[in-house]
Regions:
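Conserved, carboxylate-rich catalytic/transport cores that coordinate ions
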Residues: 1-346
């Protein structure tokens, strides 16, 4: 039931302080019992969501270890804990339920978080690329598209090329955005979804709160004329924020690798284009670029259909997922670029 309440917090904790897989808890017994019960329900919600087709992306996020001067001296993989999943499930449930309330108000505009179907051409390209990596899946049927994507993500969960394929699948998806017209959320497999709550506070959440409050109080919704404009603007700002985040990560990668000039690393080919090859270093997940002119022992050409780099005389091939030994040739902090030199294909 929807209603206005005041929540009084009795304690404050964060997911990293709660280890749901261990017997030791840093919280009192009563709170522990409540969290364990909530977690049981969250697991059922999660399983139900997966059964209905929700896609579970689990791409590894990389963070940086900083010294006192805030300079990167190491990298670390951000761990997703069971307690993070607990919070996520109730957040998704709240967002879904508020969208359900909005959908019943047919004569009033409200805000939805929508995610369109994937681009057909990108899915065909994804099928072709993963087939060359040894995975045979089709994504041309809406009835089993969610299921096949999840099967692929599950199959690669322990594979060396996991991070690469995760990235390729994410790139094949449409961008989620805000809209007053509900078309559903493909990734979550929800017919109705909005952004009512999150670990961060977004302005869009506040718009949703105001609209929900007006519905609960029975007052007239104001500002409908500007709602579509706000949705478009906030979707644009979100894109800019995402680009800024990626740029900051790349900048930190370059700063970190600036102390690794002439050192050798094992990496995986993560991208191929006419100008050269992208390689993600396995150890620290930093990505660098090998210029096509720097590929040794032959003149190489990019074969777009096969998505590979081919030596004109030696017929040497470089494909996505190939492991290579590279040397850090240099960095450019201004251009946020790591230049790599190929030593050999492994």
């Amino acid at each position: 039931k929807e209603a206005q309440f005041i929540i009084e917090n009795k304690t404050t904790t964060v997911p990293r302080e709660i280890s749901l897989t261990k017997k030791e808890y840093k919280i009192n017994k009563k709170l522990k019992e409540g969290i364990v019960l909530l977690n049981k329900i969250a697991k059922k919600l999660r399983q139900e969501r997966i059964t209905k087709g929700s896609i579970l992306f689990n791409k590894k996020e990389v963070g940086f270890v900083l010294n006192k001067e805030k300079e990167p001296i190491g990298t670390k993989i951000k761990e997703t804990k069971e307690s993070n999943n607990l919070v996520e499930e109730y957040m998704l449930l709240a967002n879904k339920e508020v969208a359900e309330i909005f959908s019943k108000k047919k004569n009033k505009k409200n805000v939805y978080r929508v995610h369109d179907l994937p681009n057909e051409e990108k899915l065909i390209s994804l099928e072709r690329i993963i087939k060359k990596l040894g995975y045979n899946y089709r994504f041309d049927n809406m009835n089993n598209m969610h299921k096949n994507i999840n099967k692929l993500l599950l199959e690669i969960s322990a594979a060396p090329e996991k991070n690469l394929i995760d990235t390729l699948v994410i790139r094949s998806m449409s961008k989620a955005k805000y809209n007053t017209k509900n078309i559903g959320h493909f990734g979550l497999s929800f017919k109705k979804y909005t952004h009512f709550t999150s670990p961060i506070r977004r302005y869009l959440d506040i718009i949703v709160h105001r609209n929900l409050q007006r519905i609960l109080l029975g007052t007239t919704t104001k500002g409908d004329k500007t709602l579509e404009e706000k949705c478009f603007y906030l979707s644009e700002r979100e894109d800019l924020a995402t680009k800024a985040e990626r740029s900051s990560i790349k900048f930190m990668q370059v700063k970190y690798m600036s102390s690794k000039i002439n050192k050798q690393f094992v990496g995986t080919i993560s991208g191929i284009m006419e100008r050269g090859i992208f390689v993600e270093i396995n150890k620290n997940k930093c990505e660098g670029f090998i210029k096509i002119k720097d590929l040794p022992n032959d003149y190489f050409v990019f074969k777009e259909k096969e998505y590979l780099m081919l030596g004109r005389h030696t017929k040497e091939e470089y494909r996505l997922g190939d492991e290579v030994l590279v040397k850090v040739g240099g960095v450019d902090e201004h251009k946020k670029r790591i230049d790599l030199l190929l030593i050999e294909k492994l």
